[in-house]
Amino acid sequence: MKDPIDDQIPKRIKHLQFGINGPEEFVKDGTVEVSRRDLYTMTDRSPAEHGALDLHMGTSNKQINCATCGESMADCMGHFGYVKLALPVFHIGYFKATLTILQNICKDCSSVLLSDQEKRQFLKDLRRPGIDNLRRSQICKRINDHCKKMRRCSKCDAMQGVVKKAGPLKIIHERFRYVRKSQDDEENFRHSFDEALKTIPELKMHLSKAHDDLNPLKVLNLFKQITPVDCELLGMDPEHGRPENLLWRYVPAPPVCIRPSVAQEGATTEDDLTVKITEIIWTSSLIRAALSKGTPISNLMEQWEFMQLSIAMYINSEMPGLRPSDMPSKPIRGFCQRLKGKQGRFRGNLSGKRVDFSGRTVISPDPNLRIDQVAVPYRIAKILTFPERVTTQNKKHLQDCIRNGPDVHPGANYVIDRESGFKRFLRFGNRNRIADDLKIGDIVERHLHDNDVVLFNRQPSLHKLSIMAHLVKVRPWRTLRFNECVCGPYNADFDGDEMNLHVPQTEEAKTEALELMGIKNNLVSPRNGEPIIAATQDFITAAYLLSLKDTFLDRKSISNICCYMMDASTHIDLPPPAIIKPRCLWTGKQVFTVLMKPNRFSKVLVNLDAKTRSFSRIKSKTPEMCPKDGYLMIRNSEIIAGVVDKSVVGDGKKDSLFYVILRDYGALEAAEAITRLSKMCARFLGNRGFSIGIEDVQPGKSLSSQKEILVNKAYATSDDFIMQYAKGILECQPGMDQEATLEAKISSTLSKVRDDVGEICMDELGPANSPLIMATCGSKGSKINVSQMVACVGQQIISGKRVPDGFQDRSLPHFHKNSKHPLAKGFVSNSFYSGLTPTEFLFHAISGREGLVDTAVKTAETGYMSRRLMKSLEDLSSAYDGTVRSSNSDVVQFVYGDDGLDPTYMEGDGQAVEFKRTWIHSVNLNYDRHDSAMLPYEIIDYVNRALDDPKFLTNCNRDFIETIRTFVIENIAKYLASVRERRDLAPMLEEPDMDDLDDMEGDEFAPVAKRKSVENIIRVTEKQLRSFVDRCWEKYMRAKVEPGTAVGAIGAQSIGEPGTQMTLKTFHFAGVAAQTTLGVPRIKEIINAAKTISTPIITGQLINDRDERSARVVKGRIEKTYLKDVTSYIEEVYGPVTTYLSIQVNFDTISKLQLDITLADIAAAIWNTPKLKIPSQQVTVNNTLQQIHVHTSSDGKSSETEVYYRLQTYKRVLPDVVVAGIPTINRSVINQESGKIELFMEGTGLQAVMNTEGIVGTKTSTNHVMEMKDVLGIEAARYSIISEIGYTMAKHGLTVDPRHIMLLGDVMTCKGEVLGITRFGVAKMKDSVLALASFEKTTDHLFNAAARFAKDSIEGISECIVLGKLAPIGTNVFQLIRRTEEEEEQKPKELLFDTPSLHQLEITA
């Protein structure tokens, strides 16, 4: 154990202040000035003094000690040096900041280009307390925009032009760019070139391009003149640094240990940074010599530029904008390259690092282990150790471990003395003596033992259940083994997967791991509360076979099976046999009774009604009479009816057996039940035998002949459609052309063939058929897989369509060109049993390849998406006041998920209680014949009183209380009343009025037989009702989200993890034919807050939603119609006086399209087309001929050629003029669902659609989040994000609790604008520099933080991990305050000047 009090507390970093070092700091921090180009001395090859490898900066040689601190290579942490530059140079990291400051100041007097009044206003905004980085950067942007527009300095009246970048690290000032008339300043500037023009007259032609060159020296002098107040306006803090520090005057030389020399065969290879430092020193010395001796200015400028590039590449070797000649021959690693990227310092060594006390090997299954155990090989157990402190209780055991030593298990590797801290390795020395000398308080690093806590992890770690705590079971052999039921959360299989093991090194860590990450506490997925640890594959098959109606066991067999599942310590009470004569037999279902309730002392009484996979309802019969025994009914842990299949013992179902035990009796009982099932099923199936062979998939003769008939019939139907298409008489489906209609019809015909053949195949295979058993019980495969093996593989689909034509208008060279026949487009009529023909094999391979490519692409896409989600949401946690806050205490949600409930504990679909099952459970547990039955009005009265209890009103959500009340009234009281009415008794929903004689008769005078018959059907007692209400309250309180829960991280994983199960390229037909993007691309669009999306669709409700004709009228108003759609022809007319285009309008088409337009409307559309620029007088309307004439210009000045070409232009552009509808709506589709008609519109323009006559504007929405925000505001955008992500997930059959999606929606919109989860959005969401640096654009964020003197308070998750600080989340969310007892009254200390001797005597007159 750790000592309770520790006086040696390590210091914790409270905050990081970023800034820019000035020359003084570089000299002060540096231990030596680096001024020599030589690395080693010529005499003895030792590091040269004042060279780049000077020993004062540390050493990279094991034999030499540091000259500054005297330590060896292992202990010296290194010291900085500095290089003094001959001339200042620009800093590549602050180049953008330098450019911005130059744009903001006068290039003569360095004053900020604002008036005094503007300065005061901006300073007031910048000095506002509590201002965040986003707001500050917006103010600085406004100042920059303002200054860029100023043409003269208000202080010195100097001209100001454009300051811009010219090539890498070059800034120019085009002072006279905006001068219209020549001014004195410009004249003077021009005259300054007179002398040069005399010498080189050719310069005159380039004089107009002359500009000021703002070299580093000039910029440095300008920056030195900036006043402290102006520094604030430039976004800098004059206390921490000034603008002139943005330029290099001294360059730091990093410690030698981060740029070590590699010695090889008498020579050394130097690090890239060392080489660059020598290059900088050499160039600087050349410039210094040139300045002292004098040299042509061109040479000096060239050397200065070279030094500038060298220093830039020293910082960032991937500097943009370099000429190929300036690029190094091989890429070098500058400072930026060492920090950024996956392998850089941030992501590779700070946020994520390699750890000690971890092991990795192949995994294999072992059903004999408990689900919370992991079998660890002896070899690993002897290497991984746990530091156990010696106490009186464990001293003897630890002494035995020490005597065994490191090579015998259970042994120990090290002993650490408590007083001296000396660590002793037990491979050497006298172990017996060491064991005898062991003192209380010493630490023994012992081997792993049984029941030690370890963390078990499989990569990729997609959600929090990818790393969980197991208990060790040390076993022989070489693999890590665990129970197969735990494969689900790890997504593990045993085809060669490897997994990692981590050993927590303190008692607190062990406890926390067990409580928070233990298997028993993580049986359900936090994504939606569904069970994730449950029976799998063979276990399900065995359970199914055992629970069939025809499975009977004698006493020997059932005793054997019961012993399979228990350990020797559990007492078993066999249930009474189901058949007594001629001999005692038990049913397979009774085995499950023992599994749930092994003996009479067990308190587990399961009550459950659930549909299994084989359930089919028969009219006029109760569900448990299902012919396939497909309705499971359990009462008090006894199976009354139903088989046990995947839906009962598998994962992903909330009405499964283990989930019910978990919710009613806790995690311990549920884990115990899963362990029993896995032991029993593995052993039972091993003895019974279960195999699959080729004869299992052999089709019978009748199946083959029926398949032949069905396939030939489908081919004939397809040929008929192809013939209609060829003749052009195929009737088009809504929103499709003939080709698309043909494809849709053939596809539906062929898919029906496979389904029909599959049905026949299922009927023909016997009940003992192994593949069919597996498909039926859900342990592996589906009925489609079986029918593909036996009967027919079916149509191959590529990107949602039949196989496309590859080359020369055909899918393969084996077919005719443009063939649409099923065989030519990927229909495989053979089964895998009969074998595929060569063409079928190729089609099947094409389809298979698409799946592989899709998976590979999807993995990278979803991985990056998950990382971005995690980075943006990781800081969010629930606080003690119920709010969800970010690390800097910004409120993101006032109540988590609008109700404060944890998705992990949701029993129903997003509800804390599954009322129906809870009611059945309460009724069966509290059944007593002697309790009096309640009447409907008594039930209502009791529940109203119970729900008005303060414990409900203060702790529960009002909606939850109302849901309970509604359930009891509708499902219990009213049902009882209806049963009474059917038995001719008064319903009694209201309390009888004692004054009314009719009411007084009541139940007392009703026949006993009738009352009994009602009670046989439904009998409600007060005890049952009380139990039900109490259970509801308990479950609700348990489901409340705990303070400190990392709701953000769990939400990010819950959205990111299902992404890996989604297909990538997925299109889905919304309604009839509006093709919408789904899957990963759609989720990406939403979380990126994309301005343009691939398939924007507006859904509009119609005022008259029953009449199709009125829907067509509205469609005509919305869908854009081109001129070419409503014209018969357009012809050119060349007359003696005028030439024009004659457009013949077809009013039959206009009436068919239900368009409300006239000739005048079409003419107006033509002259309003901006592309044509036709004056209105050139467009004339002829109503009698229903024609529009578009004339060429009437001025008569145009030549014949001009007139001809103008007519051709008109003729080309006019057909595409939009004459009706909304130009941004490409098309609209009428969709009829459940009798109601609605419109789907492809395109944008929500506001225009909402204002269209015939559309209900308040019930119109779009799937384009940004458009929703622009038209309806930020709340609408939030709702749109939530509904769109939910819809996309649901379309892929994935359930994600809405609370996770709501949190994402709130994070994206809580700043008042829709911020995408991208590097730009995250930068606006977070203020922390380290968090942004560990995400993307590492060095950019660090340079920006330094330039604006940012302060990082280190409160978020990323920052705390980088700096090794405990993150304020989970068990660390609270702070402890120790109240000291004041023994005596504290008196204030006397001040120095209160001492009388220090006072002068007062002199009185």
From Swiss-Prot:
<keyword id="KW-0862">Zinc</keyword>
<dbReference type="InterPro" id="IPR038120">
    <property type="entry name" value="Rpb1_funnel_sf"/>
</dbReference>
<keyword id="KW-0460">Magnesium</keyword>
<keyword id="KW-0804">Transcription</keyword>
<dbReference type="Pfam" id="PF04998">
    <property type="entry name" value="RNA_pol_Rpb1_5"/>
</dbReference>
<dbReference type="InterPro" id="IPR000722">
    <property type="entry name" value="RNA_pol_asu"/>
</dbReference>
<dbReference type="GO" id="GO:0046872">
    <property type="term" value="F:metal ion binding"/>
</dbReference>
<comment type="similarity">
    <text>Belongs to the RNA polymerase beta' chain family.</text>
</comment>
<keyword id="KW-0539">Nucleus</keyword>
<dbReference type="InterPro" id="IPR015700">
    <property type="entry name" value="RPC1"/>
</dbReference>
<dbReference type="InterPro" id="IPR035698">
    <property type="entry name" value="RNAP_III_Rpc1_C"/>
</dbReference>
<dbReference type="InterPro" id="IPR042102">
    <property type="entry name" value="RNA_pol_Rpb1_3_sf"/>
</dbReference>
<comment type="function">
    <text>DNA-dependent RNA polymerase catalyzes the transcription of DNA into RNA using the four ribonucleoside triphosphates as substrates. Largest and catalytic core component of RNA polymerase III which synthesizes small RNAs, such as 5S rRNA and tRNAs. Forms the polymerase active center together with the second largest subunit. A single-stranded DNA template strand of the promoter is positioned within the central active site cleft of Pol III.</text>
</comment>
<feature type="binding site">
    <location>
        <position position="66"/>
    </location>
    <ligand>
        <name>Zn(2+) 1</name>
    </ligand>
</feature>
<dbReference type="InterPro" id="IPR007081">
    <property type="entry name" value="RNA_pol_Rpb1_5"/>
</dbReference>
<dbReference type="Pfam" id="PF04983">
    <property type="entry name" value="RNA_pol_Rpb1_3"/>
</dbReference>
<dbReference type="GO" id="GO:0003899">
    <property type="term" value="F:DNA-directed RNA polymerase activity"/>
</dbReference>
<keyword id="KW-0240">DNA-directed RNA polymerase</keyword>
<dbReference type="Pfam" id="PF05000">
    <property type="entry name" value="RNA_pol_Rpb1_4"/>
</dbReference>
<feature type="binding site">
    <location>
        <position position="76"/>
    </location>
    <ligand>
        <name>Zn(2+) 1</name>
    </ligand>
</feature>
<dbReference type="InterPro" id="IPR007066">
    <property type="entry name" value="RNA_pol_Rpb1_3"/>
</dbReference>
<protein>
    <recommendedName>
        <fullName>DNA-directed RNA polymerase III subunit rpc1</fullName>
        <ecNumber>2.7.7.6</ecNumber>
    </recommendedName>
</protein>
<feature type="region of interest" description="Bridging helix">
    <location>
        <begin position="838"/>
        <end position="850"/>
    </location>
</feature>
<dbReference type="GO" id="GO:0005666">
    <property type="term" value="C:RNA polymerase III complex"/>
</dbReference>
<dbReference type="InterPro" id="IPR044893">
    <property type="entry name" value="RNA_pol_Rpb1_clamp_domain"/>
</dbReference>
<feature type="binding site">
    <location>
        <position position="109"/>
    </location>
    <ligand>
        <name>Zn(2+) 2</name>
    </ligand>
</feature>
<dbReference type="GO" id="GO:0003677">
    <property type="term" value="F:DNA binding"/>
</dbReference>
<keyword id="KW-0808">Transferase</keyword>
<dbReference type="InterPro" id="IPR035697">
    <property type="entry name" value="RNAP_III_RPC1_N"/>
</dbReference>
<dbReference type="GO" id="GO:0005739">
    <property type="term" value="C:mitochondrion"/>
</dbReference>
<feature type="binding site">
    <location>
        <position position="106"/>
    </location>
    <ligand>
        <name>Zn(2+) 2</name>
    </ligand>
</feature>
<feature type="binding site">
    <location>
        <position position="497"/>
    </location>
    <ligand>
        <name>Mg(2+)</name>
    </ligand>
</feature>
<dbReference type="Pfam" id="PF04997">
    <property type="entry name" value="RNA_pol_Rpb1_1"/>
</dbReference>
<feature type="binding site">
    <location>
        <position position="493"/>
    </location>
    <ligand>
        <name>Mg(2+)</name>
    </ligand>
</feature>
<dbReference type="GO" id="GO:0006383">
    <property type="term" value="P:transcription by RNA polymerase III"/>
</dbReference>
<dbReference type="InterPro" id="IPR007080">
    <property type="entry name" value="RNA_pol_Rpb1_1"/>
</dbReference>
<feature type="binding site">
    <location>
        <position position="495"/>
    </location>
    <ligand>
        <name>Mg(2+)</name>
    </ligand>
</feature>
<feature type="binding site">
    <location>
        <position position="79"/>
    </location>
    <ligand>
        <name>Zn(2+) 1</name>
    </ligand>
</feature>
<comment type="subunit">
    <text>Component of the RNA polymerase III (Pol III) complex consisting of 17 subunits.</text>
</comment>
<keyword id="KW-0548">Nucleotidyltransferase</keyword>
<dbReference type="Pfam" id="PF00623">
    <property type="entry name" value="RNA_pol_Rpb1_2"/>
</dbReference>
<feature type="binding site">
    <location>
        <position position="153"/>
    </location>
    <ligand>
        <name>Zn(2+) 2</name>
    </ligand>
</feature>
